[in-house]
Design a protein with these regions (language model features):
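N-terminal glycine/serine-rich phosphate-binding loop of ATP-dependent small-molecule kinases
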Residues: 1-86, 132-134, 139-162, 175-194, ...
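Glycine-rich and small/hydrophobic secondary-structure elements
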Residues: 47, 204-220
Length: 240
């Protein structure tokens, strides 16, 4: 690529519009706003990129940097269009997502409705194990309960799984063991471990974050794969 002809491209994908800005070597800007294609966001990106490159009379290979922002993950959560997601947690903590921190918008309103958790109750599986807050093993991981959890994940045909065990932020050993077993039996499943995503104290926040990450992983993976394929048609090096 000729460095003297290098350009920078910004793409921001929203639910309604996709905005593109191309910065050319001489400092001029070429902009475009196109309708987003919700079924396949990459279509609007590809169309918009082709337009700005043509208007600027530059080739895709002259784009040095692509900066991309998207609401794909946010929309998947808001619209509840994420993956069929399961949760593996410590025995006794299956209902943590509902219990939360007992904070209600209207404290004394018994009829108020709360948003449903991203993981259905039947897709939450418990394993017998326990660590204390120092990461010391109080109860070793029970392999039989772990195997039952994996069997449940397989029978429900889940696409993604969040593994969030109590006090895993202090010691990820049990989470890693569960994840290794899942990968061995179900290599196609997208896995998210709380000890990797948010290794911090406070179980509800850690579990919610891990579940949200698992919920959108397959959606984003498909989106980015499609986007990379799209970029192959405009530049010989989509990863550069």
């Amino acid at each position: 690529m000729n460095g003297e002809l290098a350009c920078r491209l910004g793409v921001d994908v929203g639910g309604t519009f996709t905005d593109l800005v191309l910065l050319t070597p001489d400092g001029s800007l070429v902009t475009r706003k196109v309708l987003s294609t919700s079924g396949n966001y990459a279509e609007a990106i590809f169309s918009g990129i082709a337009d700005v490159l043509q208007e600027a009379s530059v080739a895709g290979g002259d784009v040095k940097e692509l900066i991309h922002g998207t609401t794909v993950a946010t929309n998947a959560i808001i619209e509840r269009r994420g993956a069929r997601t399961g949760l593996v947690t410590t025995e006794g903590f299956r209902d943590l997502l509902e219990i939360g921190r007992l904070r209600l918008m209207r404290l004394y309103d018994m009829d108020q409705e709360r948003p449903a958790p991203l993981v259905r109750r039947r897709w939450r599986f418990e394993v017998a194990e326990r660590l204390n807050h120092h990461g010391e093993v109080i109860r070793p991981l029970d392999r039989d309960t772990a195997e039952r959890a994996i069997a449940g994940i397989a029978s429900e045909n889940l696409e993604a799984v969040a593994v969030c065990l109590i006090h895993a932020y202090a010691n990820p050993k049990h989470e890693q063991a569960v994840a290794a077993s899942i990968r061995q039996r179900l290599p196609q499943v997208y896995l998210t471990l709380s000890s990797e995503v948010l290794p911090e104290i406070r179980e509800f926040e850690r579990t919610s974050t891990t579940v949200a990450n698992a919920y959108v992983m397959p959606v984003l993976d498909r989106y980015l794969s499609t986007l990379e394929t799209c970029l192959l048609y405009t530049s010989p090096s989509p990863r550069d």
